[in-house]
C-alpha cells in the first residue's frame, strides 16, 4: 500500500483524485507541482521492501497494493519502475512471489484482485474480500452489516470455482481486537469445515 504520509507519494494533481485522502485543509507536508518528485518516493518504497526482505528471514510473497493510482495515468506508469522493483525483490529472495493486485505489467507471479474476478488468468489467483462491507479497516458505520457465514461460504465457493485462494480481511477494532460480528462469522465458518 501507499504511505500517504510521505511528502512525495503519488499526489492527486499528478495521479488523480484517489491517490491520497482529500483532506481539507490539504496536508501541509504533501509536495505538489515542481516540488513533487515521485522518484524520491519510489526509492523510499524500494528501501522499505529491502528492509522487509533482508531483516525478517524468508518471505513467501510480496503483495503490492494501490494499483488504481498507476493505472489512472497509463502514459506515466513507467515512473513507478515496477519491473525494476520486481527484479530487485527477486534478487534479494528469488522464491518470493510478487503480485500487484490484478496485474500492472503482466509479469507478476499471481493476481490478487479485490472482491470479484470474472474471466480467466494465466497465473494463480488470490481473491481479496472483507468481512465489513466497503471497508478494509474498522468502520463504525458498518455495525450490524458485517458478512454472515453464508456470505463467506459463497465467497469461498467463488474462489474455489476460480481455483483461487481467498484472502479474507477483518478490520480490527481500535484496541486491536477482532469485531464480535466477525468472530461469530469466522467461528461458524470454522464449524462448517469440521
Walk through the language-model features, giving the residues of each.
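Mature catalytic domains of secreted/periplasmic carbohydrate-active enzymes
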Residues: 1-194
